[in-house]
C-alpha cells in the first residue's frame, strides 16, 4: 500500500478514485514524565515524551488509514494530510487525524 502526501504518484497513473478514507489515533501522555517535559520545553529542550506519543499516534493512524483503504481494494492513498490536536487542557493526550483519497492505480 502506497501512502503519499502528493495528489499523484510519478509513473503510476490513477485508474479510479475510490473515496476519502480517514483514521485517528489517541495517545495518552505520562503525566509525571510530561511534568518534566514542560520544564525542558520552557528552557528550549526537546520533549521525548511528547515526541514519542506523536510518533506512535502518527504510525497508528497511518496503519489504520491503510486498513481502511484495503477494505476498498485500493492500491494507494494519495493527498494524505495529518492533523494533530491536544484536546486536554492539561496536555494529557495527543490525537492524530489522517485523511486521504483511496485510489486504484493503472
From Swiss-Prot:
Highest taxon of the lineage:
Bacteria
Q: Which Gene3D superfamilies match?
A: Hypothetical protein apc22750. Chain B
Checking InterPro entries in the record gives: UPF0145_dom_sf, UPF0145_YbjQ-like
Q: Which Pfam families match?
A: YbjQ_1 (PF01906)
Q: Which residues form a coiled coil?
A: none
Family, according to the entry, reads as follows: Belongs to the UPF0145 family.
In its UniProt entry, what is this protein called?
A: UPF0145 protein PSEEN3024
Task: Cite the source lineage.
Answer: Bacteria, Pseudomonadati, Pseudomonadota, Gammaproteobacteria, Pseudomonadales
Amino acid at each position: 500500500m502506497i501512502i503519499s502526501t502528493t495528489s499523484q504518484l510519478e509513473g503510476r497513473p490513477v485508474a479510479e478514485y475510490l473515496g476519502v478514507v480517514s483514521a485517528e489515533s489517541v495517545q495518552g501522555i505520562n503525566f509525571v514524565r510530561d511534568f518534566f517535559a514542560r520544564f525542558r520545553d520552557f528552557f528550549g529542550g526537546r520533549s521525548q515524551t511528547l515526541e514519542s506519543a506523536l510518533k506512535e499516534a502518527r504510525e497508528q493512524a497511518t496503519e489504520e488509514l491503510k486498513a481502511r483503504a484495503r477494505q476498498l481494494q485500493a492500491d494507494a492513498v494519495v493527498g494524505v494530510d495529518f492533523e494533530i490536536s491536544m484536546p486536554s487542557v492539561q496536555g494529557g493526550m495527543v490525537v492524530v487525524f489522517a485523511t486521504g483519497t483511496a485510489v486504484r492505480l493503472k
